[in-house]
Each structure stands twice: as C-alpha cells, then as structure tokens.
Amino acid sequence: MINVAIVEDEQEAVEYLSDCLHRYGEKTGETFSFTHFPEPITFLEKYKPVYDLVFMDIRMPMMDGMQAAKKLREADTSVLLVFVTRMGDYAIQGYDVGATAFIKKPISYFDFEMKMKRIIFAIRQRDSQVITIVSGTAVHRF
C-alpha cells in the first residue's frame, strides 16, 4: 500500500486527485491510502514520516506550498513530493526542495497517469534501498 498525503485547499482538486488515485489503482492494481490536509500548517504540525508520496498545492492561505515543502524536507528527505498547481513558474524552485514532479491544474488524467508511472517506479526504487523501522507510533527510514 502506498501512503499518500494531499495538502490542498481546493476541495474540487482533492476530489479529482482522489478519483485519479482510485482510477490508477484499478488500472494497475496499486493500492493507496490517503489523508487530506486542507492547509500546510496542520500537515506539518502532525507530520510523521509515514507517507510515501505528498501531493501539495503551491498557492494556499497562511503558508504557501514552497515554504511548506522546505519545512517538510527538514523533517523527511525521502518522501516523494509532487506539486499540483496552476503556478508553473515555480517549477525551477521545486528542484530546490526535491520535487519529483509537477502536475498542472486543471489536472488531466493522462498527465496524472504518466507522472504516476515514474513516481511509483521511484517509490519502489527508494524502498529497495531503505530500511523502515516501526516502533510504536514512530516510523524511521534509514
């Protein structure tokens, strides 16, 4: 199972991303568990390194996705990060925080599927090189 966090303030985008994940799962046999965070502050306050993949909007109230991504990287360097945004001009900055991909809004399923193939490959590759230790409620990756 692939654990996904969706950090997105637009409910329509959250619903479409979850539909895309379900559709992709039905097509490929992948299973996903996802948690939605409507704003990045709550996501960061509650963050534990249990996610394989984080979808994050860039333009959000109180803290933008780029700032949130920098803080995320302080807590977890191995989680895959995908920006979902209308703001394509942030693509270069995304490399500074190790973004794996950008998905442009409005989201097209074809684009989503193409990027997910690369993302799943990257998750599998990372997992083959990482040891995960679960101790109570803590998860550590080495």
Regions found by a protein language model. Name each.
Residues 105:
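A Lys-centered signature of the CheY-like receiver
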Residues 114-142:
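Conserved binding/recognition cores within well-folded domains
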